[in-house]
Amino acid sequence: MEKFTTLEGVAAPMRIINIDTDRIIPKQYLKTIKRTGLGQGLFSEMRYNDDGSEYPDFVLNQPAYRHAKTLVVGDNFGCGSSREHAPWALADFGIRCVISTSFADIFFNNCAKNGILAIVVSPEDLEKLFQDAERGANATLTIDLAAQTIKGPDGGTLHFDIDEGRKHNLLNGLDEIGLTLDQKAPAIDAYEAKLAQREWA
């Protein structure tokens, strides 16, 4: 899993509440267990017209936001069914950070397991971030995980809270398997060294 340290760039604003996992990645894309290729289905019912052409008014189809790595979204993002394909699709599209006032618990945890930083802020701070994001290509956000800060285009800084374990895993690029190996590495090394001394075993 890719480490998350500092992320700088344009943030795409989506002033929509209760975006559920069905809207993040519709059911027709759930037939695969591969984590790659799902980016094309991200928000597909909002991104594309019935004929497959892009819906020009959708934020991620607009030139300023087409390559955004951060989303600023409405309350209760990721609600609905507990499909892990939702963070897979976000990650495959290139999204590394999602900021809102609240997230569904399962989605929130799945984000961290897939290298996505989900940040919870106050309604007042979210409004500031929406206003910054809506300025388009001329305004960037800088998210510093180690410092737990979001710096706006005019230099203003917001602080966010995060669980220390989640922070450690994201900073070091550790998913569940990586975390297990990281924690058990000394014991594994000791066991292998002991085996090496017992050539007859």
UniProtKB/Swiss-Prot annotation:
It is an enzyme of class 4 (lyase). InterPro entries: 3-IsopropMal_deHydase_ssu, Aconitase/3IPM_dehydase_swvl, AconitaseA/IPMdHydase_ssu_swvl, IPMI_Swivel, LeuD. One of its GO terms (molecular function) is 3-isopropylmalate dehydratase activity. One of its GO terms (biological process) is L-leucine biosynthetic process. Pathway: Amino-acid biosynthesis; L-leucine biosynthesis; L-leucine from 3-methyl-2-oxobutanoate: step 2/4. Its EC number is 4.2.1.33. Keywords: Amino-acid biosynthesis, Branched-chain amino acid biosynthesis, Leucine biosynthesis, Lyase. One of its GO terms (cellular component) is 3-isopropylmalate dehydratase complex. Pfam families: Aconitase_C. It catalyses: (2R,3S)-3-isopropylmalate = (2S)-2-isopropylmalate. Belongs to the LeuD family. LeuD type 1 subfamily. Heterodimer of LeuC and LeuD. Catalyzes the isomerization between 2-isopropylmalate and 3-isopropylmalate, via the formation of 2-isopropylmaleate. This is 3-isopropylmalate dehydratase small subunit.
